[in-house]
Amino acid sequence: MASTTTTILPKDHIKLRSTIHQKLIESGEKERLKVLLKSKLVEGGWRDEVKIACREYIKNNQNENFKIEDLIALITPIAKKKVPPQVKADLIKRIRKFLGPNIQNHHHHHIHIQSNTPNSPHH
């Protein structure tokens, strides 16, 4: 049995992400995933680590006139790196399960998941 490789062009990738996002919203799964993600991040200490990083930045820059946007720009990449790999893996697994066989054909493609969780650093 010959295997075929599907090449997803950038515009198709954007369309696929948009379709997935829409399905997650319409079904209510996005909201459930946000709640799950928040609880796992709190349990794992991620939220506390991000708060500490924010406090350190503010303490070290209290004499400078910085904007909240500056803090967010600095902390966001740090916060993303601190997300435990198991939490990411569990989230992706749950999304794949939700999407079912339709996405299994594309399992070798990396789908970047953007999330605006309620516990992001600017809250």
From Swiss-Prot:
Record key words, sorted: Activator, Chromatin regulator, mRNA transport, Nucleus, Protein transport, Transcription, Transcription regulation, Translocation, Transport
Q: Give the UniProt record's GO annotations in the biological process aspect.
A: chromatin organization; poly(A)+ mRNA export from nucleus; protein transport; regulation of transcription by RNA polymerase II; transcription elongation by RNA polymerase II
> Which domain of life does this protein belong to?
Eukaryota
Complex formation:
Component of the nuclear pore complex (NPC)-associated TREX-2 complex (transcription and export complex 2). Component of the SAGA transcription coactivator-HAT complex. Within the SAGA complex, participates in a subcomplex of SAGA called the DUB module (deubiquitination module).
**What is the stated purpose of this protein?**
Involved in mRNA export coupled transcription activation by association with both the TREX-2 and the SAGA complexes. The transcription regulatory histone acetylation (HAT) complex SAGA is a multiprotein complex that activates transcription by remodeling chromatin and mediating histone acetylation and deubiquitination. Within the SAGA complex, participates in a subcomplex that specifically deubiquitinates histones. The SAGA complex is recruited to specific gene promoters by activators, where it is required for transcription.
Q: Which Pfam families match?
A: EnY2
The UniProt entry's sequence similarity note says: Belongs to the ENY2 family.
Q: Which organism is it from?
A: Dictyostelium discoideum
**Name this protein carries in UniProt:** Transcription and mRNA export factor ENY2
Q: Enumerate the transmembrane spans.
A: none
Where in or outside the cell it occurs: the entry states: Nucleus, Nucleoplasm
GO cellular component terms, semicolon-separated: DUBm complex; nuclear pore; nucleoplasm; SAGA complex; transcription export complex 2
InterPro entries, per the entry: TF_ENY2, TF_EnY2_sf
State the Gene Ontology terms under molecular function: chromatin binding; transcription coactivator activity
